[in-house]
Regions:
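Extracytoplasmic/periplasmic substrate-recognition and gating elements
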Residues: 76, 278-315
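Hinge/lid segment of periplasmic solute-binding proteins
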Residues: 106-156, 168, 174, 285-289
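Extracytoplasmic/periplasmic solute-binding protein
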Residues: 146-150, 156, 177-222, 263
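Glycine-centered hinge/linker elements that transmit conformational signals in sensory
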Residues: 216-250
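A structural signal for short loop-to-beta-strand junctions that line the ligand-binding cleft
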Residues: 92-93, 97-100, 128-160, 185-189, ...
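Short helix-initiation/N-cap motifs at beta->coil->alpha
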Residues: 80-90, 107, 247-260, 271
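Conserved N-terminal structural module of periplasmic/extracytoplasmic solute-binding proteins
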Residues: 3-4, 12, 16-108, 287, ...
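A ligand-binding cleft/hinge motif common to bilobed small-molecule-binding domains
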Residues: 108-113, 270-283
């Protein structure tokens, strides 16, 4: 219960700072601490909190504020760096020794609920009142809420260096790759991740999604009777990969390339915005994903609208 109360407090703090909520929090109390703190007075309350490296400072501040608001309870809260993307594997592989409180992305919730790893949020009405409807819906399974919304920006787009690209240049992937290649530079994307590869399939009429059981999924990306076929997309990707201006790399390598000047554009998300803006300065640019050539057509690349949450270990 104490862990859930901490998460509620952290969720409200982050929402206020990150702008996820579309409603005022001035008169909303999510997860009041009165009862849980009274029971815990004069006892040591131990908690283990995970957060990403970039969020250590703000997480520490929120925990200190939580302690201040609950004087009389002896808190022993340990903060450990752990990337959001690793939460599912880390928790499900050792749920009893995992963190009590941790951040997760919306695409991890279904499997973690199926594994019995997430604590059901009790103050649902307060969360619905305070937060974005889409964020609440994405963390709700069978009418039960399993996370406090933190952000609504878990998607990706195109970063580009304005010293090389004009506003019109970034409309097509072909054009951007030609410019990168002509300058001996690279445009990058992580093709090792299905999350990013979705961008080539999302606007083609092909389909994938979660089945009614909430665990298994369906996918027809190998369809041969649709206007755009799976083999068409595969060929388009082969053509992209063959261009001198393209480089397949993970996010850390993307940032390293921006730093050394070899990368002048790349697909990533808001988590890299501050660093890229620092490096490119006035030449910093960001825009929706471009179109790409597939089966002789220009297809608009897709992205995800995703959310992040603070969740509580059910154990």
């Amino acid at each position: 219960l104490i862990a859930a109360t901490l998460v509620a407090a952290m969720g409200v703090s982050l929402l206020t700072g990150c702008g996820v909520s579309n409603k005022s929090h001035d008169n909303t109390q999510v997860g009041t601490t009165e009862n849980s703190s009274d029971k815990a007075k004069n006892k040591e309350v131990k908690m283990h909190v995970w957060c990403s490296k970039d969020d250590v400072d703000i997480t520490t501040q929120m925990i200190e504020s939580f302690k201040e608001a609950n004087k009389g309870t002896d808190f022993n809260i340990i903060i450990e760096e752990s990337e959001d993307s690793d939460a599912r594997n880390n928790i499900l592989s050792n749920v009893h020794n995992g963190a009590d409180v941790f951040p997760i992305a919306d695409d991890q919730i279904t499997s973690m609920v199926a594994g019995g790893a997430l604590y059901e949020i009790e103050d649902v009405d307060a969360v619905k009142k305070a937060d974005d409807e889409g964020a609440v819906e994405a963390a709700t399974i069978d009418g039960k809420l399993y996370g406090y919304p933190l952000t609504a920006d878990n998607g990706y787009f195109m970063y580009y260096n304005k010293n090389y690209f004009s506003d019109s240049d970034v409309a097509t992937l072909d054009g951007m790759l030609d410019i990168a290649g002509a300058n001996g530079k690279y445009l990058t994307m992580d093709w090792s991740s299905g999350w990013y590869l979705y961008s080539f399939f999302g606007n083609t009429g092909l389909d994938f999604g979660v089945n009614d059981d909430g665990v298994t999924n369906h996918c027809n990306w190998n369809a041969i009777i649709t206007d755009i076929k799976g083999v068409d997309i595969a060929q388009a990707m082969l053509d992209i990969a063959a261009k001198p201006g393209f480089k397949n790399c993970v996010q850390d390598d993307f940032i390293a390339g921006v730093q050394d000047g070899s990368i002048i554009a790349g697909v990533s998300g808001c988590w890299n915005a501050a660093k890229i803006k620092e490096l490119w300065g006035d030449d910093y640019g960001a825009v929706k994903l471009p179109t790409y050539t597939c089966a002789g057509q220009q297809i608009q690349m897709s992205s995800f609208k995703g959310y992040k949450y603070m969740a509580v270990n059910a154990y």
